[in-house]
Amino acid sequence: MAEVQQLRVQEAVDAMVKSVERENIRKMQGLMFRCSANCCEDNQASMQQVHQCIERCHAPLAQAQALVTSELERFQDRLARCTMHCNDKAKDSMDAGSKELQVKRQLDSCVAKCVDDHMHLIPTMTKKIKESLSSIGK
């Protein structure tokens, strides 16, 4: 049961990441590469100046990647805390003498609720990421 729930979340997050990559990150990569190429075209610039120019070109993309990573980690941490709470409740039930099958059902139900609750957060997280990305480099 838990594997099915994990797969649901993974597929939803993968779809979100692909959407963000296709619609936002890819454009930023193109800008970064074109900007970097322009840095290299400057025959008057020193090696250090070219390097600094390329670093400036890369900064918005690095910021974007850090933002996406941070949001995904925050989401993952929240989901992990929720499922850890389910595990704690299951352990408490076992310690209180509940039957193993009953505890397993309780755990599966709790984990499914965690996943459902967090699946509903993905569209909001996606919107927040895309809005933040659109303001980077402007």
Curated annotation (Swiss-Prot):
It comes from Rattus norvegicus (Rat). The lineage of its organism: Eukaryota, Metazoa, Chordata, Craniata, Vertebrata. This is Protein FAM136A. GO terms for cellular component: cytoplasm; mitochondrion. Belongs to the FAM136 family. The modification N-acetylalanine is found at A2. Keywords: Acetylation, Phosphoprotein. The modification Phosphothreonine is found at T124, T126. It comes from the Eukaryota. Pfam families: DUF842 (PF05811).
